[in-house]
Amino acid sequence: MSKVIGIDLGTTNSAVSVMDGGEAKVITNPEGNRTTPSVVSFKNGERIVGDAAKRQVVTNPNSAVSVKRLIGTGEKVTLEGKDYTPEEISAMILGYMKSYAEDYLGEKVTKAVITVPAYFNDAQRQATKDAGKIAGLEVERIINEPTAAALAFGIDKTDKEEKVLVFDLGGGTFDVSILELADGTFEVLSTAGDNKLGGDDFDNIVVDYLVDIFKKENGIDLSSDKMAMQRLKEAAEKAKKDLSSTVNASISLPFISAGENGPLHLETTLSRAKFEEMTKSLVERTMVPVRQALKDAGLTKNDIHQVLLVGGSTRIPAVVEAVKNDLGKEPNKSVNPDEVVAMGAAIQGGVISGDGKDVLLLDVTPLSLGIETMGGVMTVLIERNTTIPTSKSQVFSTAADNQPAVDINVLQGERPMAKDNKSLGLFKLDGIAPAKRGIPQIEVTFDIDVNGIVNVSAMDKGTNKKQSITISNSSGLSDEEIERMVREAEENASEDLRLKEEAELKNRAEQFIHQIDESLASEDSPVDDAQKEEVTKLRDELQAAMDNNDFETLKEKLDQLEQAAQAMSQAMYEQQAGQAEVDASSSDETVVDAEFEEKN
């Protein structure tokens, strides 16, 4: 079987790796670099990808950066007057990596495993697959970045049972995942993150600092000079990297601008202490998702066996120190953090092509999935952080007599009421045979495959008529949005519980009124007029309370009506039982001695 390459398609930088001689090997690009900037530029119709594009990103307005943030959203990028989808731009980056992987391998590459953030929803995962297809790649598997990282770190450690926290601070995004490693299985227990936090933010703080000191010294604002800003950006990134191994970084930018007396230069030294002081708030922000991930997994820091550092920004000493202090463990830095995700993808590619050890990857769904049911309630079928692939079915019924169709509103979120969650799609199952409410059996099934793609179907078990929907056009949910939804669910828990209880109370009352109406309408009902009058009065009072949303009275009247109905049922039972005895005694002789009689 041909080689399956592993690609880390990053927000800021990307990398490609392949299994070679039983090990994952990162492939260098034509410029000799092991990572490739995720940047595409156009200049006079010429397409430029990678390092060359990054070098002109500030000066060339026809440059696309961080398109990963847009993937799956339907937004477009305009370059030299032409609109491109994020998938098309991503495909250009993938195609570039595919080409230099082919040069290295000396053969055509058609298959790949591509990684995505753990928080990517269905639309974003599908869009990533589409980007691969545009680039001429058959995407064998989409896997979560932290899962890929754990593969690269843990492929030889699968005989141990460990809980691992993956701390992934890249150029543009931040993800935390907690995984359990046991018996060749990697299971994601929880995920959290911040999609607006990364190495770029550290660079930007240094750029602002340099702009500020130059303005104070020379009275010139460099922020309006594109060429100067390009050089400042490159100098800031270099200084940040230098400060990972030294305590002082020299910044020298000759001829950065010009004043009345001639050219001006920027010469300064940035200390690690000053850098850490300026970026302290960013480092502190990384700890919030760490605590959230532990909380979601139901763990404490003492339950974590290993902390894995992923992403180039984890080389920043203050970040390493914060992780160590917060989790009480020395982080594992044994694999290059820039390359570890691509290597993990290559390992999974090796498993697919038969060139590697078989490892089972079990990712999770980041938010609960369900449907809207009577009363505007969200009924959850698949809980948040459920391991995928998974399938879950539940039988529902109609809410009204002779209902010909049901609308299935597919929801994602953590709130009890449907309106507070995100609707992923809506479809209709019609052709339901006429029947009283509650009789038809509608089986709703949620299927999530290994790539996190959701398929929802509804089948009328009476007619076997079926409708389904694949969720592929929902707008993307960012880490921030998911965190917000989870946070809102926690903050509104008591109010949500009240609303859900009220909705359930109304549903119960409505069903009971329906049953009472059927009983009272029965012509052969043995209930006396006094009982009927009492039950009818309570039924009307219950209906009025329901119409007025008077839930205190509703609960009181429902309890009273249930007691009255029980008394009515008991009377009906006793009367029917007494009648049955009379019928039985009067028919005993007939039963024993009867003969059929033919009448002319």
UniProtKB/Swiss-Prot annotation:
Keywords: ATP-binding, Chaperone, Nucleotide-binding, Phosphoprotein, Stress response. The keyword Transferase does not apply. The modification Phosphothreonine is found at residue 173. Residues 569-600 are annotated as: Disordered. Residues 590-600 have a biased composition (Acidic residues). CDD domains: ASKHA_NBD_HSP70_DnaK-like. The keyword Acetylation does not apply. Pfam families: HSP70. Residues 569-589 have a biased composition (Polar residues). This is Chaperone protein DnaK. It comes from Erysipelothrix rhusiopathiae. The lineage of its organism: Bacteria, Bacillati, Bacillota, Erysipelotrichia, Erysipelotrichales.
